[in-house]
Amino acid sequence: MITEFIDGLQQFHFLQNALITAIAIGIVAGAVGCFIILRGMSLMGDAISHAVLPGVALSFILGINFFIGAIVFGLLASILITYIKSNSIIKSDTAIGITFSSFLALGVILIGVAKSSTDLFHILFGNILAVQDQDMWMTIGVGVTVLLVICLLFRPLLLTSFDPVLAQSMGVRVKIYHYLLMVLLTLVSVTAMQSVGTILIVAMLITPAATAYLYANSLWSMMLLSSSLGALASILGLFIGYSLNIAVGSCIVLTSAVFFLISFFIAPKQRKNKHALSSH
């Protein structure tokens, strides 16, 4: 199977595009996912990934680039969730659940209204083997931009992630960095939609980062390990999906889940935690 996969990479341009795109998404999703994990915003990541669906559908209806619609609706969902949480007795998880389910339902309706040739299944679950050259370069461009922003603003992002109260007292505008992270999350969600679809995007964001969290002792090392695991899961998932002729996006997610499952039992932090629990 490995030989066939390598031969396919040498012969088929679409497979080369798929591999490069998958690696790029794995790297950038792994990096952004670390901040999502540290901020306890896994549900927010799920909401944003679902919220881009109506934006994509509306973009098809209006004949504009789907990046524009997806980013607008991703930010709209973020603002709506924050507003509901800040101006009512409703807790954040409830606000997130209401918002993401509503946006997902709206997206399905808009796709039906658009009557486009775009397959709903591919939007929901991805089709990385259909990635074109322009999609690949756009993914790389977005990935480089997101990573550059993280590097340039690493310190305030780190501070607002670990201790927002301290950051506020130091004059850091916490809300601005919160919404900046939402922008980065939306960008990653839009690019990852091509590989795993809107349904499974959150797994690309959360699972490699959660696995890295079991090993890392600093945010930098966590980001590096998470991105590496994301890229490795993407490569192996593409190999398995292509070789067995099954859904590549799902293979990527399941490969990442296997990494986490193994780490859950062997990671040093986990062993220490189990030892501490057993001693009580």
Curated annotation (Swiss-Prot):
Listed GO CC annotations: ATP-binding cassette (ABC) transporter complex
Membrane topology annotation: Multi-pass membrane protein
Listed SUPFAM superfamilies: ABC transporter involved in vitamin B12 uptake, BtuC
Record organism: Streptococcus parasanguinis
Any Pfam family matching the protein: ABC-3
CDD domains membership: TM_ABC_iron-siderophores_like
Top-level taxon of origin: Bacteria
Similarity comment: family membership: Belongs to the ABC-3 integral membrane protein family.
InterPro entries: ABC_BtuC-like (IPR037294), ABC_TroCD (IPR001626)
Function of the protein: Part of an ABC transporter complex involved in manganese import.
Subcellular location as annotated: Cell membrane
Main location: membrane
GO BP terms in the entry: response to zinc ion; transmembrane transport
Protein name from the UniProt record: Manganese import system permease protein ScaB
Coiled-coil regions listed in the entry: none
Membrane-spanning parts: 18-38, 61-81, 94-114, 139-159, 174-194, 196-216, 222-242, 246-266
Key words, A-Z: Cell membrane, Membrane, Transmembrane, Transmembrane helix, Transport
